Amino acid sequence: MERKEKGMGIKARRLLAYIVLIIISILCLVWFYILFINATRSKGELTQGFTAIPSTHAWENWTNVYNGSIPIFRGMLNSLIIALSSAAVSTYFSTMTAYAIHAYDFRIKNAVFTFILMIMTIPTQVTALGFLELVQKMKLEDNYIPLIVPTIAAPVTFFYMKQYMDSVLPLSLIEAARIDGAGAFRIFNQIVVPLMKPAIAVQAIFTFVSSWTNYFTPALILHEEKMKTLPILIAQLRSADFLKFDMGQVYMMIAFSIFPVIVIYLVLSKYIVGGVTLGGVKG
C-alpha cells in the first residue's frame, strides 16, 4: 500500500512537471505566433489592436520590405558573417582556455580562473567608450574584425566549458594520451573537442543568437549602409518618418531576421538537453 502511494506521488509530480513545462513552452511560443500574425497585417489593421487570426497582407509587407531602400539581404549576410564567425571563434578558444585550466597545474591557476570570472561582472557599456577609441585609433571602423576578434575572450562560454569539462574529461585520459606520445594540440583537437561537442553546440547556439541580436556594439562601429547588420537596419526602419512608417514592414523584417536563428537552433538543438544535463552533473 505504501509503495503504491509512493508510485502515485511520483506520477503526480511528473504530471505537474509536464503541465508546468507545457505552460512555459506555450508562453515562449506565443510571442513568435504574435510576431508572425502581425507580419501578415497591414498598417491600418495593426492600429486596430491585437487579433489571433492571420491577415492577407503578408506578401504586400514582404514586397514593400524587399523593394524598399533598406538592403535586407546584405544586412543578413553581414549578420551571418559576424554571428557564425563569433560562434566558431568563441567556442573554440573558450574550450581551449578551459582545457588549459583543467589539464595543467601552474602557480597562478586559481588566480587566472577567478580573474576570468570577474570579467563577467563588467557590462559591455562600461568598456564601450575605450573600445570605440581603440577601434578608431586602429582604423577598424566599418569592419567585421572588432565584432569578431573580441569574442575570443568570452568568460561565460569559458565557465560553461570548464564546468562541462570537469564532468566528462578525466585527467587520466589526458595522461594516457601523453604517454602514447600525443602532443598538446593533438590531444585537444582529437580527444577533447570530440568529447566537448554537446557543450560546444550549446554555446554555439547561445553565442550565435547573442551576436545575431546584438545592436549596441555594431551600431557604434558600423556606419556604411553596406556594412550594417539586421538589428541596425530594423532600427532604421522603425525610426523612419512618421508618415512613411509602416509597422507591418517592421514585423515582416523581424520575422525575416529570426529564420536563421530558428534554423541554427533546429540543427543543433539535439545537443542542448545532453549538454546541459552532463555539464551540470559532476562525475
Q: Model regions: which residues?
A:
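A structural signal for multi-pass alpha-helical bundles of membrane permease subunits
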Residues: 5-7, 13-283
